Amino acid sequence: MRRVIRSSRYERAAARLLRPSVQQELEESIAAEPERHPLIPGTGGLRKARWRRPGGGKSGGVRVIYYFMLRPDVVFRADLYAKNEKENPTHAERNQLQKIASEIQREFGG
């Protein structure tokens, strides 16, 4: 069974941006195919999933930043934001995400 870990930042954003049923659907989709979404260059292996929210319109989707480790089969949800807030992480945010990826690798041995 795949283990899912959520950062406090992710949980706060999910509570603000997603209904519980949409959050569950999103998380199940990523857990089922974690390697499906593109890697974000310069982040040490984090990925970005795009997800459409019901009734959100063209700019109403969200982006999930996550890290997947095959062994020990962990998906770590690092961040979530609305598309209308930003399209991609800034250079500074990518540097921070790279640090997060390194910490996850140290913690879980990936």
Task: Pin down the residues of each PLM region.
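Amphipathic alpha-helical interface surfaces
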Residues: R6, V22, L26, K58-G61, ...
